[in-house]
Amino acid sequence: HYPLRRQRQMCIRDSFPNLSTGQIDVSTRIVNMDEGARADTNLEALAKLRPVFSPKGSVTAGNSSQTSDGAGALILVSEKILKQFNLTPLARFVSFAVRGVPPEIMGIGPKEAIPAALRAAGLKQDQMDWIELNEAFAAQALAVIQDLGLDPAKVNPMGGAIALGHPLGATGAIRSATVVHALRRKNLKYGMVTMCVGTGMGAAGIFERM
């Protein structure tokens, strides 16, 4: 229900446009929101889904991000280049950290990467005003939130990967853009992007609004 609620809030607030899309051998249709969140599901149906990785596991198709397409791009420059081309920055990239955990618990890599990024920036966790925690699976995102004591109100305020999709290779840029624009729109100071990576890695980066 959380992804669906976040998605509806976004559509109402930002007035998402209708886009015509075409697919090979499929008629054109109108798309005006992400397709991951399903309004026709319920807790009883979700509870009947089989675990994906382990017979007694908690990860199912119902609490995982969907296969999705997407693209994203960022421009990161030095202060020298900023001045040379008279550019106006949207944010400052404060720090970045990569850490790892045993592969069998790969989803909680951000648990180690977040404190490392905070140390590198000389900042405290409660100074983060907005946190984009990529939820490839709900279980790993919830584990990171619980273990680090993150404020749920600051985590994925506009919905995470289950609501909006997780296009491999683009998620980092998309989540970073989300943070930067949210900081500017809401006049906040610090934002963080963090995600798990296959084989146990975790990454986290901190942005400061300019």
Where are these regions (language model features)?
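Active-site-proximal alpha-helical scaffold in enzymes
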Residues: 6, 74-80, 145, 167-188, ...
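Cysteine-centered functional microenvironments
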Residues: 56-67, 97, 127-136, 155-171, ...
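Active-site pocket-lining segment
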Residues: 16-18, 94-163
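Flexible, glycine/charged-enriched surface loops at secondary-structure junctions
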Residues: 6-9, 86-90, 125-127, 152, ...
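Condensing-enzyme catalytic core mediating Claisen C-C bond formation in acyl metabolism
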Residues: 41-108, 112, 119, 177-178, ...
